[in-house]
From Swiss-Prot:
PANTHER family: COCE_NOND FAMILY, PUTATIVE (AFU_ORTHOLOGUE AFUA_7G00600)-RELATED, PEPTIDASE S9 PROLYL OLIGOPEPTIDASE. Homodimer. Pfam families: Peptidase_S15, PepX_C, PepX_N. SUPFAM superfamilies: alpha/beta-Hydrolases, Galactose-binding domain-like, X-Prolyl dipeptidyl aminopeptidase PepX, N-terminal domain. It catalyses: Hydrolyzes Xaa-Pro-|- bonds to release unblocked, N-terminal dipeptides from substrates including Ala-Pro-|-p-nitroanilide and (sequentially) Tyr-Pro-|-Phe-Pro-|-Gly-Pro-|-Ile. InterPro entries: AB_hydrolase_fold, Galactose-bd-like_sf, Pept_S15_Xpro, PepX_N_dom, PepX_N_dom_sf, Xaa-Pro-like_dom, Xaa-Pro_dipept_C, Xaa-Pro_dipeptidyl-ppase/CocE. GO terms for molecular function: aminopeptidase activity; dipeptidyl-peptidase activity; serine-type peptidase activity. The keyword Repeat does not apply. Removes N-terminal dipeptides sequentially from polypeptides having unsubstituted N-termini provided that the penultimate residue is proline. This is Xaa-Pro dipeptidyl-peptidase.
Length: 761
């Protein structure tokens, strides 16, 4: 374990003393540090009346137990504090450490010892070996009662809301939409979980089209074959129009007011929401139009879908109506809500957070968007090509519609509405235009970057630099496009398409607690969070602060002095093998074992680089045909320790999200010996070589120059590292698999790579 603490708010000695006293610790400024430490320890043994025995189980040095020490006349030393602090945080002497000073240095322990009250205060805010902060562990053990009132420590809400007395209710929010032309406004089902309290409370909202169920068989049947011919396109310039965001003005309902009349027993919850539920935040889960319990069509990513989620935030602020049922005869008021909302969730869920933020909806104070899509074209297409998300060849937006249109999972709904649904789905399948792979109005209507200037909320993004599902370009684009007037924060980790709130190496939960206590509960805690926090790829459990995602300097590296050719065609056996399992293709590609058609360029580095942003390949090429795919990957190649991309369990169910509530595993990315690491990659239709909206003809055997931007990353490279560039045609994981007989020739003497860095790195 190594500490990377971003959540602690520096506290003055007097303030620390008052907070400790407020928690019930019997401290006294007139007493010695030793006496105050003993009082602190005895009060911490919440489940034991025999505190002498509890003290006797702690040690203050390699030979003395704490009970003996406190009965003696020995002075309290720094070494004594170090032994005790480590034990309070769950580290075991003679197992985890023998020399506390050296161990504390190794784990980057953030606590100082100048003032006993400041020191104990900071200690309480530190995470233990199990992942829980000491204060959270003590509250769970009974330091404070679950009295359904707010209690704070170091600017963060504590788990004092009773999760055994939760209210679970369902309402149906009326939208301004009619996505299936039914003649009625679409209703959206909302599942609410909230503590029983007299306070008006903020809301953690997860907008998840998956939460009411998914239709795997329909999606599987809809999934496309990737084998086919790459189209030769007519040269043209694509025209699109940005439509202003607008919706029908709603007026207050005059219907009778009623409490919610529908409840539920269970819903798959997001554990970060659970953490905040026990701290006085309501949790709501909304699947939006076209899902089970709601009405309407699954419009998949456009602003109609976004509006269906926006209506829920408007209801929390008293602006639209929610009904007790589909009868629409009684309304429910959100009189428990303070109107302030934070959205949460990963992937599609985080994507809806971005879309909501771009509406500028009142009441949305914070989005916590993890691995979020910023433009749907970049999810299912790339540079004029159909480009499946990593791991899902053949998926497209209409396949996702089939997966998430969960109304068809309800038989009565199916027989009434499936014909209309199928007609709308067919229209969607035509609009996505798999034949050309080009940008068009349909994709433009699902590009949230067009409305990013409307964002008013505070923004928190997390993204994996090894996420080839929702690729890093999504967060790179949106984060750098956000208005300068808002506060924005970005956590970039070395994992794939995963959550990071339950990792051992970073206090993400506690940082979000400080931020949401500030923004949604109005606590003036002076919390400041850095703009870009990046997981260092060279060292285990180490996070660094950067000024920006994207460097201000470009380093140029030549690619060689020869001309090399890439064949596209494979023999039938090899082609069928790679089509059957794209992982076989990737393995052969990265090994460079002459089984795949590729150009491999090894670039031994002559100095250190902190790669920060989008690498670009500047290539002089010619092709033998009027169509061609060019794919590229950049690898850090050669044996050394690197991160795996999927976190593994450190301790099972050790993370407590309240008082023994919704426990989950503590995880971390393994750091092990490996042969290579993908830094970046990309694919390009050479007919779209200038920009996304311009289609140009290819003249066979005629040289032309291209600039090819790859996926952005932040990656520390060292002098002597081998940077491997692989150039090839068909990517069997992502692109159309056209086995046509064409080739691409690259003039390496006229080609180079640019690496984005910060000046001086």
């Amino acid at each position: 374990m190594r500490y990377n603490q971003f959540s602690y708010i520096p506290t003055k000695p007097n303030e620390a003393f008052e907070e400790l006293k407020g928690l019930g610790f019997p401290l006294n400024k007139k007493n010695s540090d030793k006496a105050n430490l003993e009082a602190f320890l005895r009060h911490s043994f919440l489940n034991q009346t025999d505190t002498d025995y509890a003290l006797s189980l702690l040690i203050v040095d390699a030979k003395t137990d704490a009970l003996t020490f406190f009965k003696s006349n020995s002075d309290l030393t720094l070494e004594n504090l170090q032994w005790i602090y480590l034990q309070l945080l769950g580290f075991i002497p003679f197992v985890d450490f023998k020399d506390p000073k050296a161990f504390l240095q190794d784990i980057n322990f953030p606590v100082s010892y100048d003032n006993i009250f400041q020191s104990l205060h900071h200690l309480l805010a530190c995470r233990g070996k199990s992942g829980n902060t000491l204060i959270d562990q003590l509250v769970a053990d009974g330091l404070l009662h679950a009295d359904n009132h707010y209690h704070f420590f170091n600017g963060k809400s504590l788990a004092t809301f009773n999760t055994n007395q939760l209210i679970r209710e369902v309402v149906y929010v009326e939208t301004s939409l009619d996505t299936m032309s039914s003649g009625e406004h679409d209703l959206v089902k909302v599942n609410i979980i909230r503590p029983t309290t007299e306070h008006t409370i903020p809301t953690m909202m997860t907008a998840s089209p998956y939460h009411q169920g998914i239709n795997d068989p329909a999606a599987d049947q809809k999934t496309y074959q990737m084998e086919g011919a790459l189209a030769v396109k007519q040269p043209k310039h694509i025209q699109v129009d940005t439509k202003p965001f607008k919706e029908e003005v709603k007026h207050p309902s005059k219907l009778p007011i009623s409490p919610a009349t529908e409840s539920f027993t269970h819903i798959d919850s997001y554990s970060l929401n659970d953490y905040f539920l026990s701290r006085g935040f309501a949790n709501i889960y909304v699947s939006g139009v076209g899902t089970a319990g709601s009405t309407g069509f699954m419009t998949s990513g456009d602003y109609q879908q976004i509006q269906s989620f926006k209506a829920v935030i408007d209801w929390l602020n008293g602006k639209v109506t929610a009904f007790t049922s589909h009868k629409r005869d009684k309304q429910v008021k959100a009189n428990w809500s303070n109107g302030l909302v934070a959205t949460t969730g990963k992937s599609y869920l985080g994507t809806m957070s971005t879309g909501l933020a771009t509406t500028g909806v009142e009441g949305l104070k914070v989005i916590i968007a993890e691995a979020a899509i910023s433009t749907w074209y970049d999810y299912y297409r790339e540079n004029g090509l159909v480009c499946s998300p990593g791991g899902y060849p053949g998926e497209d937006l209409d396949v996702l519609t089939e997966l998430t249109y969960s109304r068809n999972l309800l038989a009565g709904d199916y027989i009434k509405n499936n014909d209309c649904y199928q007609a709308l789905l067919n229209e969607q399948s035509k609009a996505i235009d798999r034949q050309s792979g080009d940008y068009n109005q349909y994709w433009h209507d699902r590009n949230y970057l067009t409305h990013v200037n409307n964002v008013k909320s505070r923004v928190v993004y997390t993204h994996g630099l090894q996420d080839w599902n929702v690729k890093p370009r999504h967060v790179y684009k949106v984060f750098n496009a956000l208005p300068q007037t808002i506060k924005k924060h970005l956590f970039l980790h070395q994992g794939q398409h995963v959550y990071m709130h339950n990792w051992q190496s970073i206090d993400f939960r506690e940082s979000m607690n400080a931020l949401l206590s500030q923004e949604l509960l109005g606590i003036d805690n002076h919390f400041q969070l850095e703009e870009v926090i990046w997981q260092d790829n060279t060292t285990e459990q180490t996070w660094q602060v950067l000024d920006a995602f994207g460097g201000n300097h470009q380093e140029q590296i030549g690619l060689g002095d020869s001309k090399k050719l890439i064949d596209n065609h494979y023999d039938k056996e090899a082609f069928d093998t790679y089509c059957k399992d794209f992982n076989v293709f990737k393995n052969d590609l990265f090994k460079g074992n002459n089984k795949t058609n590729q150009i491999t360029i090894n670039l031994p580095l002559k100095k250190n680089y902190l790669l920060n942003g989008q690498c670009k390949l500047h290539l002089r090429v010619k092709t033998s045909d009027k169509k061609a795919i060019l794919s590229a990957q950049i690898l850090d190649y050669g044996p050394k320790k690197r991160f795996k991309d999927t976190p593994t369990i450190k301790f099972l169910n050790s993370l407590d999200n309240g008082k023994n509530f919704a426990r989950e595993a503590l995880r971390e990315l393994p750091f092990t010996k490996d042969h290579y690491r993908v830094i970046s990659k990309g694919v390009l239709n050479l007919q779209n070589r200038t920009d996304l909206l311009t289609i140009e003809a290819i003249e066979p055997e005629q040289w032309f120059d291209i600039e090819f931007s790859l996926q952005p990353s932040i990656y520390q490279l060292s002098k002597g590292d081998n940077l491997r560039i692989i150039l090839y045609t068909t990517d069997f994981e992502h692109t159309i698999r056209d086995n046509a007989s064409y080739s691409i020739t690259v003039d390496l003497s006229q080609s180079y790579l640019t690496i984005p860095t910060n000046q001086g790195n």
